[in-house]
Regions:
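Short internal beta-strands
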Residues: 30, 41-47, 81-87
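Short, active-site-adjacent cap segments at secondary-structure transitions
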Residues: 50-53, 89-91
């Protein structure tokens, strides 16, 4: 049996953390790729997916903390977790730089995540063998 070709993937997460089954599918798919030896160029959180990157998220008792699961995966695999800056700002998610820029006095981008523009997504999709999107457009 021939060896499996290892591919370079870009994952786009458009579903919010409250859409637990879709959000968990994105995480588990990414985990499976890494276990199989594939490379994940980056994970790009877009539209409602940016809500995953809020350090202020506190899921209800019994719900998964998808933010912490992504953070753990990022640490273990040195993943790039990009968050669309326009969608993040629209949803009140800012890093220290944007907080200072807009004189907000606080920031809430969870550790392990970074703000990025659509240019990073475009570059990643050109560099990847496969692009997989989770979540319906809103």
């Amino acid at each position: 049996m021939p060896a499996m070709d290892l591919l370079n993937y870009c994952i786009i997460v458009r579903c919010g953390p409250d859409q637990e089954s879709q959000a968990l599918s994105a995480l588990e798919f990414t985990q499976a790729l890494l276990v199989q030896g594939h490379k994940v160029e980056r994970v790009f959180f877009y539209q409602q997916g940016v809500l995953t990157a809020s350090s202020l998220r506190t899921p209800a008792q019994g719900e998964l903390n998808i933010t912490k699961l992504w953070q753990q995966l990022q640490i273990e695999n040195k993943l790039v977790l990009d968050v669309c800056i326009a969608a993040a700002l629209h949803n009140g998610i800012v890093d220290k730089t944007e907080s200072e820029r807009y004189e907000l006095g606080a920031h809430n981008l969870a550790s392990g995540f970074q703000l990025a523009g659509l240019g990073q997504l475009a570059g990643a999709t050109n560099a990847c063998d496969r692009v997989v999107t989770f979540g319906a457009s809103q």
